Amino acid sequence: MKFETEEQKRLREKKERDERIRKRIELGLLKKVLATTVAYNVDDTSGEKPDISGINDWDEYWKHYTEENFTDQHCASCGCSLDASNRVGAHIRLKGEKDGTKDAWIALYCDSCNKSRKPQKVNAESWIVRTKMDKEHENVPTSTDLLMEKLFG
């Protein structure tokens, strides 16, 4: 039988708690983003869709997520400095189509850039919700309504 020291037990419990919080953040942000803004379609052949059920109190997750992840807050479009008064959280991306991880993050826009972004209707068969423009994928906007209809009929 394996015995844990108090320190090992504390570290294990902290790791488990952090993992639960991370999963809740990921699912809560995804649910919020799908319901309120534009999702991006990318070439993803896995067809795997994340489970977004069972999340009710994502304000707590949003607060936790922003405090830990947004140290340098600038608009993803124009690059202006953001604060709580002009910040709009717009997209998250679930990494992991290739390596199996499920890290979530969100792109921030100022009010004016967020209002000027225009979604286009595209095929939502293969998708991953995305945030930052990165070099490995070409981002094609998808309307939220089309994606919600695809997910929930």
Predicted regions and their residues:
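Long, low-complexity, compositionally biased polyampholytic IDRs enriched for Lys/Glu and Gln/Arg
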Residues: 9-15
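Short, charged surface segments at domain edges that flank catalytic/cofactor-binding sites
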Residues: 24-71
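Short metal-coordination and nucleic-acid-contact micro-motifs, chiefly zinc-binding Cys/His arrays
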Residues: 67-73, 103-106
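Core catalytic machinery and nucleic-acid-binding channels of phosphodiester-processing enzymes
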Residues: 72, 83, 114
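Short cysteine-rich clusters marking metal-coordination/redox-active sites
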Residues: 75-78, 110-113
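Histidine-centered nuclease catalytic patch
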Residues: 80-106
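Polybasic, low-complexity binding patches
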Residues: 98-105, 117-153
